[in-house]
Amino acid sequence: ADESRDAAGEARPAPAPVRRRSSANYRAYATEPHAKSKKKISASRKLQLKTLMLQIAKQELEREAEERRGEKGRALSTRCQPLELAGLGFAELQDLCRQLHARVDKVDEERYDVEAKVTKNITEIADLTQKIFDLRGKFKRPTLRLRVRISADAMMQALLGTRAKETLDLRAHLKQVKKEDTEKENREVGDWRKNIDLLSGMEGRKKKFEG
């Protein structure tokens, strides 16, 4: 049977030929315009931009300082009214001075309280910051189970049961030496010179010299 025919006997269409890219296609792809990479800024341009940014920042700081001075002047003008001293006698001037001193003392007390609060807050912030740094450098401690201390005998008893006593009796296999045997051995060892003299016949000669 012909391979180009299917089971019904009809002719199947021939597959499309595989087209390969020629060298011309590759050359065309290479010459196509692609997205250009950004150019690097030169050192002189960077220096110029930094100088410009510093100038702008300096102008902003000067403007903010001028605004703060203006706000301070307006606050002082509203709180501290100009004094009217015309037509005041000596006693009235003394009363006015006492009132001004009292106001100054009150303002100093308030300023001291505010400074104390600010110092306390700064100290607390520094302590909290240090605690944060300490916590970052530590590992989180896992929750441990309750530890129950148990002796070695109790542990072996729980593991081995009745065999624990036999296992833990380590001195059972050691050699037992009685005290009497030890004294006898010491006594025998201490008389070794006398035994040698008796065996060699030197005991009588020693008595002659001693006499």
Curated annotation (Swiss-Prot):
Modified how: Phosphorylated at Ser-22 and Ser-23 by PRKD1; phosphorylation reduces myofilament calcium sensitivity. Phosphorylated preferentially at Thr-31. Phosphorylation by STK4/MST1 alters its binding affinity to TNNC1 (cardiac Tn-C) and TNNT2 (cardiac Tn-T). Phosphorylated at Ser-42 and Ser-44 by PRKCE; phosphorylation increases myocardium contractile dysfunction. Ser-22 is one of three sites in the region of residues 1-48 that are phosphorylated by phosphorylase kinase.
Pfam families, A to Z: Troponin (PF00992), Troponin-I_N (PF11636)
GO biological-process terms attached to the record: cardiac muscle contraction; skeletal muscle contraction
Phosphotyrosine: residues bearing it: 26
Gene3D superfamilies the record matches: 1.20.5.350, 6.10.250.180
Disordered: region residues: 1-43
Phosphoserine: modified positions: 4, 22-23, 42, 44, 77, 151, 200
Chain positions with Phosphothreonine modification: 31, 51, 78, 129, 143, 182
Residues covered by region (Involved in binding TNC): 32-79
GO molecular function, one term: actin binding
Keywords assigned: Acetylation, Actin-binding, Metal-binding, Muscle protein, Phosphoprotein
Region (Involved in binding TNC and actin): 129-150
Any GO CC annotation of this UniProt entry: troponin complex
Annotated site, Involved in TNI-TNT interactions, chain positions: 80, 97
Highest rank taxon of the organism: Eukaryota
Assembly notes: Interacts with TRIM63. Binds to actin and tropomyosin. Interacts with STK4/MST1.
Entry-linked PANTHER family: TROPONIN I (PTHR13738), TROPONIN I, CARDIAC MUSCLE (PTHR13738:SF2)
Family, as annotated: Belongs to the troponin I family.
General function of this protein: Troponin I is the inhibitory subunit of troponin, the thin filament regulatory complex which confers calcium-sensitivity to striated muscle actomyosin ATPase activity.
Protein name per Swiss-Prot or TrEMBL: Troponin I, cardiac muscle
Naturally occurring in which organism (per UniProt): Oryctolagus cuniculus (Rabbit)
Gene name for this UniProt entry: TNNI3
